[in-house]
Structure formats: structure tokens, C-alpha cells
């Protein structure tokens, strides 16, 4: 079952840590966001394979936007 990784806040994408096809564990950092001059790691809530990365460095994302999909 696929697990969507979504943004919880409005932020810009500072770094994309994973690539499509990567095996990740629950708690691994998926992306680093920047909001109000703070770096905020977005963590995987499930282990699996990254099947889609929906953001790029520099993107401005809104709360609820899709960041990645873990299968």
C-alpha cells in the first residue's frame, strides 16, 4: 500500500534527500524544508521504496501538497 508524504506547512524545498527507487526506513529524512529561516526535516512515516518524488529544490509548497510516495 502506498504512503503519501505531504507537507504540513507552507515552506520552500531546501534539499531533496531521497531519489525515486531508494529503499528507506520509517523515520528517514525525505526532504528538508525551510520556513521562517528554520530547517524542517520531513520524515518517512513508513518503510518502503520511494516510488515518486513530487518536489524539487526551490519549490514553494503549501500545507497538504504531495512531497513523495512510498510504496
UniProtKB/Swiss-Prot annotation:
Q: Signal peptide position in this chain? A: none
- Domain Biotinyl-binding: residue ranges: 2-71
Going by the UniProt record, its keywords in alphabetical order are: Biotin
Kindly give the SUPFAM superfamilies that the UniProt entry links to this protein: Single hybrid motif
Q: Which residues are recorded as modified (N6-biotinyllysine)?
A: 37
Record-linked InterPro entries:
Biotin_Carboxyl_Carrier/Decarb, Biotin_lipoyl, Single_hybrid_motif
Entry superkingdom? Bacteria
Database matches in Pfam families: Biotin_lipoyl
**PANTHER family in alphabetical order:** OXALOACETATE DECARBOXYLASE ALPHA CHAIN
What is the official name of this protein in its record? Biotinylated protein TB7.3
